[in-house]
């Protein structure tokens, strides 16, 4: 069963590229035609590239890898946060901090600081022994850390792959991933450089519907990979991994919504399985 249909791609406006004067000649092979000064992307190619990216993400997660979702432009922020959270993956949908990958040891220390401040707040000691001014500064520090690092707060190591919406805007993230040899999976609009992406998906990276659809497809691949990982561990008799934040992995627990949705897509009734 196809992970996405041509009809869905058309409805999402995935085929609309940029104006013909704003393009990267390297994208010529992915362009079907031109209409009213706008390049039209070849969705037949998009379908095959989606399948390739889907399989890569699924296999990466099945082997224990993590996928970092990145998209800080307004059109991508909600989809990135929602879909990454749905499958327990880290995400960045605010400003990308330079060194988030290449200097992760320092970023990790900031994550520990965020958790420290959260613990102080929970214990009621964030304001307890501090002056009003000090308490205000600590509160602002916590809010800033939450805003910039909240999506990766549970990330303890570098991701096995990154999903990126708009490689031109997120060029620093792309550069850092390439420098570290982390595979880049991304939407390729007609103004992008395909040489920078390992698993490209030719498509519209500006329209909310297009971005939401393609990000959902990648999240579905993650979900299927997580299910394969859990099944493999159960077969091997190995202990279950640490739970994904906010998600229980115990065999006796009810299926999460994304698991039920995935089974439904495959024509399986979760209730008949007794889960």
Swiss-Prot record:
Keyword Ribonucleoprotein found: yes
Keyword check for rRNA processing: no
InterPro entries, alphabetized: Ribosomal_uS2 (IPR001865), Ribosomal_uS2_bac/mit/plastid (IPR005706), Ribosomal_uS2_flav_dom_sf (IPR023591)
Cross-referenced SUPFAM superfamilies: Ribosomal protein S2
Residues spanning the signal sequence: none
GO process annotations (BP): translation
One term under GO cellular component: cytosolic small ribosomal subunit
UniProt-recorded Gene Ontology molecular function terms: structural constituent of ribosome
Pfam families listed in its UniProt record: Ribosomal_S2
Keywords, alphabetical: Ribonucleoprotein, Ribosomal protein
Residue numbers spanned by region Disordered: 232-256
Similarity-based family: Belongs to the universal ribosomal protein uS2 family.
HAMAP family hit by this protein: Ribosomal_uS2_B (MF_00291_B)
NCBIfam families in alphabetical order: rpsB_bact
Record-given protein name: Small ribosomal subunit protein uS2
Native organism taxonomy: Bacteria, Bacillati, Actinomycetota, Actinomycetes, Acidothermales
